[in-house]
Amino acid sequence: MADVAWLKPDHHIVMMGDSDDVDVRDRISVAAYLFLNPVLRFGGFDRLDYESIWDLGMKAGEEYAGMERRKPDFTSLFLEHSGNTYFRSDWSERANFLHLHSGTMGAGHGHSDKLHIDLVVNGEDVLMDGGRYTYVSGSKRFSYKDPSGHNTITVDDLPFTVCKDSWECSKLSQPVKENFRCMELAEFAQAGQLGYMDLPGGVYVNRKVVYIKPDLYVLADEMYTGDRHTYQQYFHFNNHGTVTQNAPGEKKFPCVAYRGKMAEADFYFVSAQVKAELKRGHIARHYNVEEENTVCKVTKPGDGFTSLITVIDAHPGRPLSIEKLPVRSALKQTDYPETMAEALKITTGEKEYVVILCHQEVNSPTDLVEADGCMGYGNVIVFDKAEDVLVGDVLNW
């Protein structure tokens, strides 16, 4: 059933670890037939493929065609044991889909991909894992396995997992699997990793993902440390589309835009002191087949706690505005510093959302957090101002 949960809208799996870009409906179809499972049948082919009929027989093909198909009773899901979260707008082939990985590396075939995300918009890949390309030990193998080859965060341009050869590592990173919550307006997941605790001051890296359904995402990367470091975010784009960067001053925040055949997405880097640059990268959907793609690298220095907030608009044809807001103590009427709490107001046409993100324990039993007239009790809260300015969707306490 996990294969159904992590299917992308195009029926392929994400290229996680040493996986290629593979349609797995043949395996799901066989499982559906063997276990007589209508949900697996939903995730499989309409009719058994040739190889499956060869294995199971002609009668199996006829019986499979007559089986019940049942849509899963979930869209988004957290597979807590493996540490994988899947946000999905619906079960159509034109759905939006985001995957967050925060689990085990998976031995020699695993990559250094803690806190990596994949993003699909309108059924088309936007952010992708680069794949594997080769098993031959060396710089090329490591470039696909290292954190910089994934859509994740690094500290001081150092890897949190260090490859020893094609299969072994001289340093590993412990994942921290945290929580997941689905509500009517928004969904949430967060996870961390301990791969930088050996740096000066130690650095705990935490990634929060807020999904405002159906087409807005907020990434909040939090780095907890007592020292000064430089942080890097990586965004590896599908090479079947074009990636452009806005000119300085053209927009309020640095912005990178992806335009593909079916998908459009804008990435806004809303934290202060960020530098975004586009670079050439590589992607290998299949073994020994390498292509060029575009990578966005975002850099920010920080002394002590540092955050990097990114807003992803998966429907950029509409008007959009983003405003950074202070978070206040509703009782004391004082603003919290950004190292403790931050807020965003995101306006899309007639919709106006307020997102409160608390980085520290600012809540108390006698107080509420407040931003732009919206008040609630929690560490991550989303408000649709037309519906609610008190309580909100509390996604994390």
What are these regions (language model features)?
Residues 1-127, 299-307, 322-397:
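Carbohydrate-active enzyme catalytic cores, enriched for enzymes
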Residues 10-16, 94-99, 125-129, 155, ...:
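Acidic/polar loop patches that form or flank catalytic/metal-binding clefts of enzymes
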Residues 74-96, 159-213:
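Extended, loop-rich substrate-binding clefts of extracytoplasmic carbohydrate-active enzymes
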Residues 87, 123, 153, 221, ...:
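Hydrophobic, well-ordered secondary-structure elements that form the walls
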Residues 91-94, 104-105, 122-126, 132-134, ...:
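Short, glycine-/Ser/Thr-/acidic-enriched flexible segments
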Residues 112-178, 182-184:
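Active-site rim segments in enzyme catalytic domains, especially the processed small/beta chain
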Residues 187, 191-242, 299-301, 308, ...:
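Acidic, contiguous internal or C-terminal segments within carbohydrate-active enzymes
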Residues 228-283:
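Polysaccharide-binding surfaces and accessory modules of carbohydrate-active proteins
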